[in-house]
C-alpha cells in the first residue's frame, strides 16, 4: 500500500492556484480511475485506487499547506504506512514550469508544506515529487502572491500536460519504486 499525498490549500479560493498543483495531481489520478474522495480518519480526504496489484491511497490534507504534517501523520498512522510508502507531491517555484523532480529524500527547499511534514515526521526520509511552477524572477507582489496566483492560459496548458505525465510518474513510483521513477521522470515534460 502506498500513500500518495498531494499538497494544497482546501478553500475554493485556492482552487487552480500554483500552490495547489499537488491537489490537482492526486485529483487527476483519482479521476483517471473513477475514484471519489471521501473524508479520511483525520483532517484529510482520501480516494482509493488499485494499479497492477498495488493499492494507492490518494490523500489531500485539509489542514492548509503550512500544517500538512498533521494530516500526513494521521493518514500514515491510520493506514499503518511507513515513510518508505509515501510520496508527497507539491509545487516548486524554483523549477521551470512543467519540470518534474522526484527525490527519495531531502530538505524542504523552501516549500513550507514539506517543511511541516519533515518537522512532524522528524525525518527528511520520504519520497517527494516536485512540480515546477516556473518562477523566473521575483514577483512584484512577493512569493506568496505568485504561488497563490492562478495559472495563465499558457501555464495551464503546460500544467495539463505535466499532470498527465505526473500521473504516470506516480503509478511508476507505486509499482517500481522511487529510483525507477526518478530515472524515467526527472525531466521537463515535453
Swiss-Prot record:
The keyword Amino-acid biosynthesis does not apply. The keyword RNA-binding applies. The record marks 91 as: Stabilizes the basic form of H active site to accept a proton. The record marks 9 as: Discriminates between blocked and unblocked aminoacyl-tRNA. InterPro entries: Pept_tRNA_hydro, Pept_tRNA_hydro_CS, Pept_tRNA_hydro_sf. It catalyses: an N-acyl-L-alpha-aminoacyl-tRNA + H2O = an N-acyl-L-amino acid + a tRNA + H(+). GO terms for cellular component: cytoplasm. One of its GO terms (biological process) is protein quality control for misfolded or incompletely synthesized proteins. Its EC number is 3.1.1.29. Its main location: cytoplasm. It comes from the Bacteria. GO terms for molecular function: peptidyl-tRNA hydrolase activity; tRNA binding. PROSITE patterns: PEPT_TRNA_HYDROL_1. The active site is at residue 19. Belongs to the PTH family. PANTHER family: PEPTIDYL-TRNA HYDROLASE (PTHR17224:SF1). HAMAP family: Pept_tRNA_hydro_bact. Hydrolyzes ribosome-free peptidyl-tRNAs (with 1 or more amino acids incorporated), which drop off the ribosome during protein synthesis, or as a result of ribosome stalling. Catalyzes the release of premature peptidyl moieties from peptidyl-tRNA molecules trapped in stalled 50S ribosomal subunits, and thus maintains levels of free tRNAs and 50S ribosomes. Monomer. This is Peptidyl-tRNA hydrolase. The lineage of its organism: Bacteria, Pseudomonadati, Chlorobiota, Chlorobiia, Chlorobiales.
